[in-house]
Design a protein with these regions (language model features):
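Glycine- and charge-enriched loop/helix tracts that form the active or gating conduit
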Residues: 1-118, 122-140, 144-157, 261-266, ...
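A ubiquitous short alpha-helical element
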Residues: 1-2, 33-36, 133-137, 188-190, ...
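Charged, alpha-helix-enriched surfaces in structured cytosolic catalytic cores
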Residues: 5-8, 46, 98, 161, ...
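Charged substrate- and nucleic-acid-binding regions of tRNA-handling and nucleotidyl-transfer enzymes
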Residues: 15, 151-155, 210-288
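Short alpha-helical linear motifs
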Residues: 51-56, 90-91, 187-194, 209-210, ...
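Short, motif-level signal for alpha-helix interfacial/capping segments enriched in acidic residues
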Residues: 97-101, 185, 225, 235
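Divalent metal-dependent catalytic cores for phosphoryl transfer on phosphate-bearing substrates
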Residues: 103-218
Length: 288
């Protein structure tokens, strides 16, 4: 009866189980399945609020209950397809959906990070191929996952900050960086100073939710990159226009350049020089 009064209580039932760690009784599950289609009447904003509470709860894996009871079929059909997509690949031991659930468990309960794990492989069903040995591959799933994530977050009326952060983490979750200072500086410049450090948590959670095949080697490789990043950050080396020793105003006043698009091009060329050799980040050097 309560579910008929406010369909959002269907989602709340799953959310409470995730927050408090209890099992939902069979009769309640049956009622959830019966009334789940009524969620189509609930506003995107209210669904978003409940989804976030579930995702940042101590048991985000209880999203599986939402799948089993037909809730995600209404609010997140893209996830249902993941629950039905196998990953026959030595690097994986779960299907796409189960891998997503495990990865959410392995990361801190922050809204942006948990949403990034929820969506990081959401594009895999659309990119699946199988080779002659029957091994599944998902080439280009990162870009497709980003596109789908953007659509979902907009559909659920998320704020622009969350959309920006989550889509970038999804786009770069598999980005490979060599453990050398120059390579790390370039990666931070490309990905962003706000996003890059969060990727270590995302990548670690992703690895923890995979098979043990080469897992320790992958973890050590990730730690090596993190150590280099921490060295770069500790030295305060320039990795963006924000900390470049010259500005557009300097180019106009000191180098007799005219305002326009050319200013931006020159600043990026100077940033490239500084990324290669941080010692060049001196105003006098760059204005020569």
């Amino acid at each position: 009866k309560r579910f008929t009064e406010d369909a959002l209580r269907i989602m709340r039932a799953v959310r409470f189980s995730a927050q408090l760690g209890y099992e939902i009784e069979p009769e309640t599950k049956a009622a959830l399945m019966e009334f789940a289609p009524k969620l189509t009447c609930i506003s995107s904003e209210r669904i978003q609020a409940e989804l976030v509470k579930l995702v940042i709860s101590p048991h985000p894996e209880n999203l599986k209950i939402a799948y089993e009871t037909g809730i995600t079929k209404v609010i997140l059909p893209e996830f249902d397809v993941c629950m039905e997509t196998e990953q026959n690949n030595p690097h994986h031991c779960y299907n796409v959906g189960e891998h997503i659930l495990k990865s959410m468990q392995k990361i801190s309960p922050d809204k942006v990070l948990r949403l990034a794990m929820l969506f990081h492989d959401i594009g895999k069903p659309e990119t699946i191929t199988m080779d002659d040995q029957g091994i599944c591959h998902f080439h280009g799933h990162q870009a497709v996952s980003e596109e789908i994530t953007l659509k979902i977050l907009k559909r659920l009326k998320f704020d622009n900050y969350t959309i920006g952060m989550v889509t970038k983490l999804v786009r770069y979750h598999d980005y490979e960086v060599e453990a050398k200072e120059k390579n790390v500086r370039r990666a931070v410049m490309k990905i962003g100073e706000d996003i890059f450090p969060l990727l270590f948590q995302v990548k670690e959670a992703d690895l923890e939710a995979q098979s043990t095949y080469l897992q320790e080697e992958k973890k050590e490789k990730l730690k090596a990159v993190q150590r280099v990043y921490e060295q770069v950050a500790a030295k305060g080396e320039c990795v963006s226009l924000k900390t470049l020793a010259v500005t557009g105003k300097d180019l106009i006043s000191e180098a007799d350049m005219c305002p326009g698009p050319e200013i931006g091009k020159v600043l990026h060329q100077l940033l490239d020089i500084v990324i290669e050799d941080p010692e060049q980040n001196e105003r006098e050097n760059l204005l020569k």
